[in-house]
Amino acid sequence: MDKKNFDTIDAALEDIRQGKLVIVIDDEDREDEGDFIGAADKVTNEMVNFITREARGLLCVAVTMDRAKELQLDPMVQRNTSQHETNFTVSVDAIAEGVTTGISVYDRAMTIKMLGDLSSTADDFSRPGHIFPLRAMDGGVLRRVGHTEAAVDLARLAGCSPTGLLCEILNDDGSMARLPQLIKLKAKFGLKLITIKELVAYQMQRNKLVQRAVESRLPTIYGEFRLIAYESFTDQHNHMAFVKGDVTTDEPVLVRVHSQCATGDTFASLRCDCGNQLASALTMIEKEGRGVLIYLMQEGRGIGLINKLKAYNLQDQGYDTVEANEKLGFKADLRDYGIGAQILKDLGVRKMKLMTNNPKKVVGLEGYGLEIVERVPLEMASNPMNQFYLDTKRDKLGHMIGCSFGPENFHIEKTATKP
């Protein structure tokens, strides 16, 4: 991306503060889309009319988790299978003087404005309606690199109510507007254009999701490591980093981001390959002489120990690991890598050789400005108890198991330059 086409975050915040819209583009490996984003409490009829005419996408309002609870904005569906984990709630219309069907420009502007008004209550809205609220993850773009979180972060940083309106931008023919079309749109209407990647960098300079709590020397059967414990500001979990050698140089560092698996890591369960991957990663780091293993408390791909054991029971009935999660009302993978990225940043890691079979983890970390120069496979020998599990990870979750590890299967070019 040519940096001259983009504006600074501060310039975008000033426009939002003045009641203007900005264009925000996300990662090309995620949705590669541009959205109009503005502050909900600054909305006008003219703004809504402009969005419906020039954007043509779905007009939504991003709210915080706490605000969604206050307004009783329940999830649109019990089982969210959205490809990008978009947290839609039930749609709403404002109950206010002058609001009729909910679809007119005036009606939608009033609904958006009332969603951005912190004095509004649940009784001020009818359900369903014509505006679609989205629940932003706590921690904003530092937890999830999406337009929903960007809208809330930008509104808050601009000094407005932490509620943002957003709408995908489509071309005249109905296709998604990509960067070349968004640059033309920026010039035509004099709008600021920013990237979520730059917003992440901006937030990382000002906010932290974790802080170092304590560091200790830890001799293990794999070798000796520095064990650093981190406290999280967004939940009650403590995360760990196993560090070997100097990881702050420009030389790429061997890195493993490992999510907790008590059954596999501690009790050597044959249902998964987690324990073997953990042991292999620590062994490889010791052999390399330098590296980092981040241990995140995200048991059961984020669903927790109790639900993971419930999923095991379903798997014994014939469900695969993805189907079991979904039957329990969860997505196949609820992990987020924002905290892991912040820990790596705190440790001074700049470039990494990432030990993973999971392409989602690659994209998840790259979204936070970390440069991954190589993917190092961690394929473990299967056993009769986990063969079906490994096949499902390959076939349904896209894990690169039993495939070529050439550069055609792993794109690293885009991390070389920041927009």
Curated annotation (Swiss-Prot):
Pathway annotation: Cofactor biosynthesis; riboflavin biosynthesis; 2-hydroxy-3-oxobutyl phosphate from D-ribulose 5-phosphate: step 1/1; Cofactor biosynthesis; riboflavin biosynthesis; 5-amino-6-(D-ribitylamino)uracil from GTP: step 1/4
Cofactor, free-text remark: Binds 2 divalent metal cations per subunit. Magnesium or manganese.
Molecular function per GO: 3,4-dihydroxy-2-butanone-4-phosphate synthase activity; GTP binding; GTP cyclohydrolase II activity; magnesium ion binding; manganese ion binding; zinc ion binding
Region (GTP cyclohydrolase II): 206-419
Binding site for GTP: R256, V257, H258, S259, Q260, Q277, E299, G300, R301, T321, T356, K361
GO cellular component, one term: cytosol
Active site annotation, chain numbering: D333, R335
Coiled coil spans: none
Catalytic activities: D-ribulose 5-phosphate = (2S)-2-hydroxy-3-oxobutyl phosphate + formate + H(+); GTP + 4 H2O = 2,5-diamino-6-hydroxy-4-(5-phosphoribosylamino)-pyrimidine + formate + 2 phosphate + 3 H(+)
Residues where Zn(2+) binds: C261, C272, C274
Binding annotation for D-ribulose 5-phosphate: R30, E31, D35, R144, V145, G146, H147, T148, E168
Keywords annotated in UniProt: GTP-binding, Hydrolase, Lyase, Magnesium, Manganese, Metal-binding, Multifunctional enzyme, Nucleotide-binding, Riboflavin biosynthesis, Zinc
Marked site (Essential for DHBP synthase activity) residue numbers: H130, E168
InterPro entries the UniProt entry points to: DHBP_synth_RibB-like_a/b_dom, DHBP_synthase_RibB, GTP_cyclohydro_II, RibA, RibA-like_sf, Riboflavin_synth_RibBA
Record-listed Mg(2+) 1 binding positions: E31
Functional description taken from the UniProt entry: Catalyzes the conversion of D-ribulose 5-phosphate to formate and 3,4-dihydroxy-2-butanone 4-phosphate. Catalyzes the conversion of GTP to 2,5-diamino-6-ribosylamino-4(3H)-pyrimidinone 5'-phosphate (DARP), formate and pyrophosphate.
Name of the protein this chain belongs to: Riboflavin biosynthesis protein RibBA
Organism the protein comes from: Pelodictyon phaeoclathratiforme (strain DSM 5477 / BU-1)
